[in-house]
Amino acid sequence: MMFRLTSVSCFLLVIACLNLFQVVLTRRCFPPGVYCTRHLPCCRGRCCSGWCRPRCFPRYGKRATFQ
């Protein structure tokens, strides 16, 4: 009986540890200068054009001119 109780306890402990690792790994974030997406967030700053940056700068390019 003691062996069965110990093996069940170990099995439940393994399941609890796997759930904990899953939460830790899925909630990770990336430092500035690393590739990011909407599903892979940045730790600090924002995801600008696919890269973690402290702040996003406006994109320069062709703009409409008003007269």
Curated annotation (Swiss-Prot):
GO terms for molecular function: toxin activity. It is found in: Secreted. Residues 1-26 form the signal peptide. GO terms for cellular component: extracellular region. InterPro entries: Conotoxin-I_CS (IPR013141), Conotoxin_I2 (IPR020242). Keywords: Amidation, Cleavage on pair of basic residues, Disulfide bond, Secreted, Signal, Toxin. Transmembrane segments: none annotated. The keyword DNA repair does not apply. The keyword Signal applies. The modification Tyrosine amide is found at Y60. Residues 64-67 form a propeptide. Its main location: secreted. Disulfide bonds join C29-C43, C36-C48, C42-C52, C47-C56. Pfam families: Conotoxin_I2. Expressed by the venom duct. Belongs to the conotoxin I2 superfamily. The cysteine framework is XI (C-C-CC-CC-C-C). This is Conotoxin Cp1.1. It comes from Conus capitaneus (Captain cone).
